[in-house]
Amino acid sequence: MKTFEELGVSEEIRRAIEELGFEQPMPVQEAVIPYLLGNGNDVIALAQTGTGKTAAYGIPVLQKVDPTQKEPQALILSPTRELCLQIADDLSDFSKYINGLHVVAVYGGASIEMQSRQLRKGAQIIVATPGRLIDLMKRGVAKLDAVCNVVLDEADEMLNMGFSESINAIFEGVPSDRNTLLFSATMSREIEKIAKSYLHDYKEIVVGSRNEGAEKVNHIYYMVHAKDKYLALKRIVD
């Protein structure tokens, strides 16, 4: 197994991720990071949940950004607010030693005015849910004409949840020569056909078995009345 240095990861990012406990690259990171750092082609990457996909695309995206330029250079789309915030937090942690680099999360259910102010101050990377990003594009606040990399995280979920129309509108606002990176745990053949409509010359990277669920994730559900959902959740968390 190679080290992060051997994969081409910069000293600033290595310092940050080592402080986070990263010791050796995970398989998806070892497969994806050098490819994205050394190649301009699009990617479909499939790997189980919890295998380090965020770092696999996040590290190369961060390393390719020019922090001296304030306009957005990378866009990461996610299906949910929770994932959006998680990705933004991770990228901020990975880039803590890159001076002048800013990551902004934009998502529904929060103040659009605050998010607008953050974007106006300058952000090289936007992490967004599709609906809120389109709102900000219509306001002229989210300008994507300098975006070089677009990432769809949990691509199958976004396409399954009916975000295709929104994603199409967003792609119309980014340069046609951008790189498109699709990351997901699973992807059906039907969804893959749709996904490929966003890609140019692409490489498919599969870590583990295709469309295999995460080995270490257990699923359980509880049946409760709607009025009792909050109390049930609180009891489970406690």
Segments from the language model and where they lie:
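Conserved pre-motif I regulatory segment
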Residues: 1-46
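The conserved Walker
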Residues: 47-51
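Nucleotide phosphate-binding site architecture
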Residues: 23, 62, 66, 84, ...
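Conserved nucleic-acid-binding Ia/Ib motif block in the N-terminal RecA-like helicase ATPase lobe
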Residues: 11-19, 69-138, 146-149, 192-196, ...
